[in-house]
Amino acid sequence: MNLTMHIFLQGCWVGRAVLNPAADGLLSLQGEVRDAFGWSEEADVLSASEMSQQFLKDAPFGRPEWESTTRYSALLRLKQSICSAERLVVVGAGSESIAVSDYPGTLFVAADGAVGAVDDLTKVLCVVSDGDGAEHLERAAQSGVHIVLHAHGDNHDGWLRLVEAWAQFEHPPHLTLTHQANVVLEGMHNPGGFTDGDRALCFIHALGRSLEEIECVGFRTDVVGQWSGTTNPERKKRKLAWMKESMRRLGVEHHLIR
């Protein structure tokens, strides 16, 4: 990248957001969730601040591909792909296995481990993840799928371990960084939402794609989906109730499996 382009992209990053600001209701939901579970916003801020600082370095984790200007360019390309997709399907943890051949002309966005439901990763535009998608997330990262990686108070060690591992790949995935704190952090975004599933919808919405033009599969609150990470089932159902509320505020509650 020449110096002129570097300065141009750096200016774009600082002066023009790729994501539209999240609605107040989607951001306030994050505080409501913290209150409901007794979580501290300070922990969210600490994890996200560490992520921001790590990725502001030259060649973060030894990878020039993860510098701010390169991540900005990758996010612009992702935005174009999401907004121009003729048919866009968002895959949640309750999805059955998906044969891409049954969805001609379709591109996918997956919520964390739900990427494992899709049999052709070349059709997956990105995975929205807080890092607990296990082998399914790992396979997507190894395949070069763009990862929208989320920092929160309970996953600091997890996201750090993942990026250290991905940095060893010959071709590491493109990264976009998100958080859920009421702060502004350089190089990161807060699209709103709480679970990987509803955060994926918030992310798509923030990029400018109308949620009236998308489809959802595997979004349900009655059971814990097969693609969810290891979790306490009852606690997970409480989290899924908040996913439902987030989807209600987005106006897409009708996408839930009843």
Residue ranges and their predicted role:
Residues N2-L88, S95-S101, V224-R258:
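N-terminal donor/sugar-recognition subdomains of glycan-related enzymes
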Residues P104-F108, E212, V252-E253:
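A generic structural motif
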Residues V183, C216-G218, R235:
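Buried, small/hydrophobic-residue-enriched core segments of structured protein domains
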Residues V89-S95, D112, D196-G197, H205, ...:
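Glycine-rich anion-binding loop/nest that anchors nucleotide
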Residues W66-S68, S81-A85, T106-L107, G113-R209:
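Acidic/Gly/His-enriched mid-domain segments of enzyme catalytic cores or analogous surface patches
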Residues T176-L177, E213-G218, H255-R258:
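A structural signal for short, well-ordered beta-strand segments and their strand-loop junctions
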